[in-house]
From Swiss-Prot:
Keyword Cytoplasm annotated: yes
Name of the protein described by the UniProt record: Guanylate kinase
Positions with a binding annotation for ATP: 13-20
Organism: Bacillus cereus (strain ATCC 14579 / DSM 31 / CCUG 7414 / JCM 2152 / NBRC 15305 / NCIMB 9373 / NCTC 2599 / NRRL B-3711)
Record family assignment: Belongs to the guanylate kinase family.
UniProt-listed Pfam families: Guanylate_kin
Molecular-function GO terms, alphabetical: ATP binding; guanylate kinase activity
Gene this chain is encoded by: gmk
Lineage top rank: taxon: Bacteria
Source taxonomy: Bacteria, Bacillati, Bacillota, Bacilli, Bacillales
InterPro entries on file: GK/Ca_channel_bsu (IPR008145), Guanylate_kin-like_dom (IPR008144), Guanylate_kinase (IPR017665), Guanylate_kinase_CS (IPR020590), P-loop_NTPase (IPR027417)
């Protein structure tokens, strides 16, 4: 039983919680039917990241032109870099009845919720703040100042989890993926998402 319009599934987390890791594992599952909406960013690619797969990497001037032309569903500036979601792909895919999966920063998720309150908003939480710091430091790509800034922002973002519908603890990647899939199955069965279609069906009897 599925509603005709696709679900917008929004996943975000504090820096260092492993959002990209969870997304990659989730999309490696054969039963995953989400359409991944790739974000646009002005930050430099990290080792192993591929343009057009992990992000669309843009120059700052290009991104600002997209803002002016209203080509972004949401955008935010985080640690000196822009991040945003192209709007055309999202709306087209939802209209086709396909689920769209976004992984975006907390600021961006709050913008999206204003435009798509019917979306499913999932906050990926760390097991603890000490574990969060270990993950950020373990990257080996950040200066001490950047690490401290990320931790400060992460604490602020955790305090904003009330804006989300669900909280999934990322203690183990596989378990986090199972929880996310279970949430989506349940959301597709919510009465308010499917009732009108069944009412239309019974009108013809």
């Amino acid at each position: 039983m599925r509603s005709r319009r696709g679900l917008l599934i929004v996943l975000s987390r504090p820096s260092g919680v492993g959002k990209g890791t969870v997304r990659k594992e989730l999309f490696s599952h054969e039963d995953t039917r989400f359409q991944y909406s790739i974000s646009v960013t002005t930050r430099k690619p990290r080792e192993g990241e591929v343009d057009g797969v992990d992000y669309f990497f843009k120059e700052r001037e290009e991104f600002e032109e997209m803002i002016r032309n209203e080509k972004l569903l949401e955008w935010a500036e985080f640690v000196g870099n822009y991040y945003g979601t192209p709007i055309d792909y999202v709306e087209k895919t939802l209209q086709e009845g396909k689920d769209v999966f976004l992984e975006i920063e907390v600021q961006g998720a709050i913008q999206v919720k204003k435009a798509f309150p019917e979306g499913v908003f999932i906050f990926l939480a760390p097991p603890s703040l000490s574990e969060l710091k270990s993950r950020i430091v373990g990257r080996g790509t950040e200066t001490e100042d950047v690490i401290e800034n990320r931790l400060t922002v992460a604490k602020e973002e955790i305090e904003m989890m009330d804006a989300y519908d669900y909280v999934v603890e990322n203690d183990q990647v596989e378990l986090a993926c199972d929880r996310i899939k279970a949430i989506v199955v349940g959301e597709h069965c919510r009465r308010e998402r499917v009732a009108k279609y069944y009412k239309e069906m019974t009108e013809g009897l």
